[in-house]
């Protein structure tokens, strides 16, 4: 996640950067997909969820054991996700246990349609540090994107219910060619509803998102969206407004913002910003982020579903994460063994090579270039790198064997 607002504040009120610990000492933010079941049918769903039960998901006892292990492992944050996490049969019990174990940060990632007047007080009482609700446009655009008529109104009611109870709530918007025109209205909605955070997510080629990868935004449209997002975020910072703006799944955003700063601030301020961005390091799959899927399989992040590090049904997450898996070790290497224009990029220390899954899905090689980088070769210090760019081709099945070890 690229915390745009946070880095804007570094330009106005600088503080020393804090570098990451040694890779073997880093504890990951864990995104736990509690269930694959979901009452919506989103076009970009990386878990290919549906409104039905799925076999093999963790039992209640297994899930409770996972919580205890994660607590003992001292992870910095736990995000309960899905599917729709509130669809899981024991969601409330798991959430209560997570709060009892006193995780440093506990978040809920939900479609918002199941939050209502009948349960929001209970949700607020659990003390979630943050509730993220997905909306992919206004009204019918969101409902088309999410596959169920009325989903927008239900999710917005969930946002309002959370705000009424004092719960910190944010909106997550996945941008595509089909809904990019709604970005201004989504930002207006955040302002009008007093939403605490806006998360712009770029499309990742996983699950249904891979099948619909042809709907990914063209580079020119992505740039226009980022121009708008930066302008609105900067306006909020200058006015002292509380809205936090972040982006995800395209770490080229950090490079784009750095270049924005270069045209507006003194060299010393830009150098300070770059030091902070390099301390952050960009893509954190397998290092600062880890994933447990509904069946208990552990992955480098939520989009690496084809690559399993182990199962919490057989070994604790803590043991799997501190094991000697070769892909995990390579993901933690800096610089990563990147190829193509990513390998030639002068900003590897800022973006970390971006989202490796897009490269994997298109080429079968997780270290190939990420086609979603929207900066030109000259902008990334790689003249000529645009002559033979990796193209986003229509989905015709996987270009790699999911059992392949990617070595």
Curated annotation (Swiss-Prot):
SMART domains recorded: Elp3
PROSITE patterns, per the entry: RADICAL_SAM (PS51918)
Gene Ontology terms: biological process: heme biosynthetic process
Binding site for [4Fe-4S] cluster 2: 342, 345, 351, 373
Keyword Iron-sulfur applies: yes
Domain of life according to the entry: Bacteria
Name this polypeptide is given: Pre-heme d1 synthase
Gene name, Swiss-Prot/TrEMBL: nirJ
């Amino acid at each position: 996640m690229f915390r745009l607002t946070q880095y804007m504040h570094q330009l106005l009120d600088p503080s020393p950067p804090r570098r990451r610990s040694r890779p073997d000492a880093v504890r990951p933010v864990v995104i736990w997909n509690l269930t694959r079941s979901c009452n919506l049918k989103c076009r970009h769903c990386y878990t290919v969820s549906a409104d039905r039960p799925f076999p093999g998901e963790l039992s209640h006892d297994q899930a409770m054991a996972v919580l205890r292990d994660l607590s003992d492992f001292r992870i910095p944050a736990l995000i309960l996700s899905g599917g729709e996490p509130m669809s899981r049969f024991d969601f409330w019990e798991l959430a209560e246990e997570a709060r009892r174990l006193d995780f440093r940060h506990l978040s809920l990632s939900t479609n918002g349609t199941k939050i209502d007047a009948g349960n929001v007080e209970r949700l607020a009482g659990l003390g979630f540090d943050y509730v993220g609700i997905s909306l992919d446009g206004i009204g019918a655009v969101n409902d088309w994107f999410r596959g169920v008529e009325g989903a927008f109104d239900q999710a917005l009611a969930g946002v309002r219910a959370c705000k009424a109870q004092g719960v910190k709530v944010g909106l997550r918007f996945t941008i595509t060619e089909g809904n990019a025109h709604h970005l201004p209205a989504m930002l207006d909605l955040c302002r009008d509803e007093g939403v605490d955070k806006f998360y712009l997510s770029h499309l990742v080629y996983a699950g249904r998102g891979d099948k619909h990868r042809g709907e990914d935004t063209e580079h020119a449209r992505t740039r226009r969206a980022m121009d708008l997002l930066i302008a609105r975020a900067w306006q909020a910072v200058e006015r002292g407004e509380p809205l936090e703006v972040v982006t995800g799944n395209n770490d080229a955003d950090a490079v784009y913002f750095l270049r924005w700063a270069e045209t507006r601030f003194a060299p010393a301020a830009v150098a300070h910003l770059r030091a902070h961005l390099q301390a952050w390091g960009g893509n954190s799959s397998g290092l600062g982020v880890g994933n447990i899927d509904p069946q208990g399989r552990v992955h480098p992040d939520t989009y690496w579903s084809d690559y399993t590090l182990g199962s919490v049904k057989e070994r604790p997450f803590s043991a799997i994460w501190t094991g000697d898996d070769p892909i995990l070790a390579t993901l933690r290497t800096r610089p990563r063994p990147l190829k193509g224009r990513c390998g030639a990029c002068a900003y590897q220390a800022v973006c970390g090579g971006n989202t490796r899954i897009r490269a994997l899905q298109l080429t079968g090689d997780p270290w190939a270039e990420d086609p979603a980088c929207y900066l030109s070769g000259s902008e990334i210090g790689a003249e000529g790198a645009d002559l033979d760019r990796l193209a986003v081709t229509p989905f015709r099945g996987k270009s790699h064997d999911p059992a392949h070890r990617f070595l």
